[in-house]
Amino acid sequence: KDEYITILQVSVPAPNLSPNLTCTITNTSKKKSKTFKLPETRNSQSSKKANPTPQAKNHYIEATKPTATKNIVGAMAPSNLNVNILTTFTHHQMSSWLMCEVSGFYPEDIHLWWLSAQTKMDPINFVTAQPVRQSGDKFQIWSVLRLPVALSPSLDTYTCVVEHEASQTKLNASKSLEISGCYHLLPESDGPPRRPDGPAFP
């Protein structure tokens, strides 16, 4: 009984050319061999068509080249949040101003609002600036709240609330503003209005 050994060889003459397929069949009993070239198969033709264009090939090479990694700052929650009193007035026709300052966060997308006694305040009462870039790709933002001092005769607490994607929970800072000492104007027939126990207003 004759026995045969089949050897398939694949050689690539050039990177942009189709591979050469040759097959050698050897009869081990008669010690005879026959080698012939195989025609291109559909797979080899497909591989030829699938060769990347020079532009695509360049993109691939650039993508596989070892490049120095750039330090990209990940999302960071605000590192500083505080509320300060800008001005306080006791004139019944004037307003007090609170400023909320938030800094050290990334990316710049952030949501800020104010609460008064745990009640969300109308956005018409405050103005929030656009985030400003700090050093190291961090951002900073301010929001100013306007408060009529005659709004309440008691100690009121105002809270600045911040929501950022890097924070697991909402962040907040509060400031209490006592407006029970606001002055009341007394009507007078002559001269400028006066405080009950003080000099006339300029």
From Swiss-Prot:
Stretches assigned to the Ig-like domain: 66-178
Residue numbers spanned by region Disordered: 32-58
Listed Polar residues bias regions: 41-56
Database matches in InterPro entries: Ig-like_dom (IPR007110), Ig-like_dom_sf (IPR036179), Ig-like_fold (IPR013783), Ig/MHC_CS (IPR003006), Ig_C1-set (IPR003597), Immune_Resp_Modulators (IPR050380)
Keyword Plastid set for record: no
UniProt-listed SUPFAM superfamilies: Immunoglobulin
Keywords for this protein: Immunoglobulin domain
PROSITE patterns in alphabetical order: IG_LIKE (PS50835), IG_MHC (PS00290)
Remarks, miscellaneous: This delta chain lacks the domain corresponding to the CH2 domain of human delta chain.
Protein name, per record: Ig delta chain C region
